[in-house]
């Protein structure tokens, strides 16, 4: 029997066997992120328009610009629903009886509200990045 095929088989199958025996990566636990914590996590992962750490502006001023950017992504209502008083820019309209079910459905599908109530993983937040 020729030893070369056995050697090649071990060389080719060795790494595959080693990888199959390696422990599976631990699944990331969802983290509850509400209000400005949610905004900051998004900025940390995605960045924002004209927003960078090198910018000389105060961080507090950047939140308003970020909220305007997120408003286009339909996340603003979820931030307001989280109850963070620092992020509420305008009074909310009074609830209407006819739109109650629509409001509940919109809140259930809102990513900001979902991250606040149930938690989000890093991968969940990356799906919200505009780029």
From Swiss-Prot:
GO BP, one annotated term: positive regulation of epithelial cell migration
GO molecular function, one term: protease binding
GO cellular component, one term: extracellular space
Disulphide bond pairs: 34-116, 46-129, 115-120
Summary of the tissues where the protein is detected: Expressed exclusively in prenatal and postnatal Leydig cells.
Main location: secreted
Source organism, top-level taxon: Eukaryota
Signal peptide (residue range): 1-26
Subcellular location: Secreted
Maturation-removed propeptide residues: 58-103
Keywords: Cleavage on pair of basic residues, Disulfide bond, Hormone, Secreted, Signal
Keyword Disulfide bond annotated: yes
Entry's family note: Belongs to the insulin family.
Subunit record text: Heterodimer of a B chain and an A chain linked by two disulfide bonds.
Functional note: Seems to play a role in testicular function. May be a trophic hormone with a role in testicular descent in fetal life. Is a ligand for LGR8 receptor.
PANTHER family in the cross-refs: INSULIN-LIKE 3 (PTHR10423:SF3)
Protein name in UniProt: Insulin-like 3
Origin species: Sus scrofa (Pig)
């Amino acid at each position: 029997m020729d030893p070369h095929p056995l050697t090649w088989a071990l060389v080719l199958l060795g790494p595959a066997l080693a990888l199959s025996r390696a422990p599976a990566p631990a699944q990331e636990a969802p983290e509850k992120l509400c209000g400005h914590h949610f905004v900051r996590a998004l900025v940390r992962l995605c960045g924002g328009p004209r927003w960078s750490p090198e910018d000389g502006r105060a961080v507090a001023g950047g939140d308003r610009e970020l909220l305007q950017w997120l408003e286009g992504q339909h996340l603003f209502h979820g931030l307001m629903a989280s109850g963070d008083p620092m992020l509420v820019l305008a009074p909310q309209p009074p609830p209407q009886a006819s739109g109650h079910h629509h409001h509940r459905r919109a809140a259930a599908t809102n990513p900001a509200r979902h991250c606040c109530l149930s938690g989000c993983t890093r991968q969940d937040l990356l799906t919200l990045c505009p780029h």
